[in-house]
Amino acid sequence: NLFQFAKMINGKLGAFSVWNYISYGCYCGWGGQGTPKDATDRCCFVHDCCYGRVRGCNPKLAIYSYSFKNGNIVCGKNLGCLRDICECDRVAANCFHQNKNTYNKNYRFKSSSRCRQTSEQC
């Protein structure tokens, strides 16, 4: 669920880091359109696409099992859609960490005027 996803992000990037991704670029936060602005925004685009492929439960609400081991996110013995959601969130949190050097404060607080291009397909 979104709370667990936030905890993954904070676990990889430090306390309160999730706030940097709530409204960023064209895809981080609720909804999304246009072309991702940078590698960080692409992490959100890929995460949105991943959630879009989940069948059988609501990715924003479903509770799954995971832990941190040696700084790595490890999804637990989840079945079906819970496994899929955990993997979506794990991959995105790792993506944010791997691309933290691309984070651009100018893209915070996304604006629909910056995201008017035709949206990419998943």
From Swiss-Prot:
GO biological process entries: arachidonate secretion; lipid catabolic process; negative regulation of T cell proliferation; phospholipid metabolic process
Can you state which reaction this protein catalyses? a 1,2-diacyl-sn-glycero-3-phosphocholine + H2O = a 1-acyl-sn-glycero-3-phosphocholine + a fatty acid + H(+)
The record's SMART domains line, in alphabetical order, gives: PA2c
**UniProt note on tissues of expression:** Expressed by the venom gland.
Cofactor comment: Binds 1 Ca(2+) ion.
Question: Where are the disulfide bridges?
Answer: 26-115, 28-44, 43-95, 49-122, 50-88, 57-81, 75-86
UniProt-listed PROSITE patterns:
PA2_ASP, PA2_HIS
Keywords assigned by UniProt, alphabetized: Calcium, Disulfide bond, Hydrolase, Lipid degradation, Lipid metabolism, Metal-binding, Neurotoxin, Postsynaptic neurotoxin, Presynaptic neurotoxin, Secreted, Toxin
Q: Where does Ca(2+) bind?
A: 27, 29, 31, 48
Which family is this protein grouped under? Belongs to the phospholipase A2 family. Group II subfamily. D49 sub-subfamily.
Subunit relationships: Heterodimer of a weakly toxic basic protein having phospholipase A2 activity (B chain) and a non-toxic acidic protein functioning as its inhibitor but which potentiates its lethal potency and neurotoxicity (A chain).
User: Mind telling me what this protein is named?
Assistant: Basic phospholipase A2 B chain
